[in-house]
Amino acid sequence: MACCLSEEAKEQKRINQEIEKQLRRDKRDARRELKLLLLGTGESGKSTFIKQMRIIHGSGYSEEDRKGFEKIVYQNIFSAIQTLIAAMETLSLEYKDPSNNEHAEFLNSIDADSADIFEDGHVTAIKGCWTDPGMQECYDRRREYQLTDSAKYYLDDVERIHEPGYIPTLQDILRVRVPTTGIIEYPFDLYSIIFRMVDVGGQRSERRKWIHCFENVTSIMFLVALSEYDQVLVESDNEENRMEESKALFRTIITYPWFQNSSVILFLNKKDLLEEKIMTSHLADYFPDYDGPKCDYEAAREFMMDSYMDLNEDKEKMLYYHYTCATDTENIRFVFAAVKDTILQLNLKEYNLV
């Protein structure tokens, strides 16, 4: 009997050892996954960044994938022109060519959210309105209302998009705007390590969904739209400055106890739009603390970078930053290579990389 028990005990011990070995393996494998949380206010460029990761480190977009964006491109175009038509009225601007009043009426009759065709009449009406000096003045005053960044890109290109057999290009896909609701994860494999990038909705109503994303975050990647310094928040009733809202969110994020051990990387995004806008919209008009020269892109972006970095009260916590243009694949390829090296360097031991 003792012999029998001994054999049973040995077998139980062997099973326990196997279980412990598997648990150690699972723990090690879990440590070889890096969770990167993309945060920032609405329209800061998070979804575009995810698309770039798919292009640079994933499977990209096949022709079939690209065809799937066709209707969304049409909807973005109709939405942009309707926003401009509404703003013409709000700003009491008139079309220089009276025939564009009829074009505007026709375009307003389209349901932008469900549009699935793009016909000759649409192109004629859009080109008429968009090239009208009255609407161009309206576009120049876009900080006074909410217009997507991609509006000009699409409206300048309606003839190409209307061509027979049109298939959206990668740039069309990067520019397309679909508000993120809920949480989107995009995992990709680099050097046998899984980078799991998590994009959450940036609008205020979406932020309550973030909470369960906060466990085991390797890095916070916080996106800032540099071009928003003179814009107000679409969700705000009191014309709150969009950059101030972004800074308030950033301050909250970097002080969360969940992120004590997470590195923080700041992406100062939309640098191309800032470079264009700073020539006519002066930073000091919106941020009186700015005492640098007017129309100076370098001075403006440095001031904004400092204003975010100064929010970090924990001087032990390192913040990293990069200036980015999320629609520029080569820029993101270069920046993410540096980010990846930083993250791996910070986690060498924990992720069994040494």
Swiss-Prot record:
GTP binds at residues 40-47, 174-180, 199-203, 269-272, 326. Pfam families: G-alpha. A high concentration was found in the retinal light-sensitive outer segment. Residues 35-48 are annotated as: G1 motif. A lipid is attached at C3, C4 (S-palmitoyl cysteine). Residues 195-204 are annotated as: G3 motif. The keyword GTP-binding applies. InterPro entries: Gprotein_alpha_Q, Gprotein_alpha_su, GproteinA_insert, P-loop_NTPase. GO terms for cellular component: cytoplasm; heterotrimeric G-protein complex. GO terms for molecular function: G protein-coupled receptor binding; G-protein beta/gamma-subunit complex binding; GTP binding; GTPase activity; metal ion binding. This is Guanine nucleotide-binding protein G(q) subunit alpha.
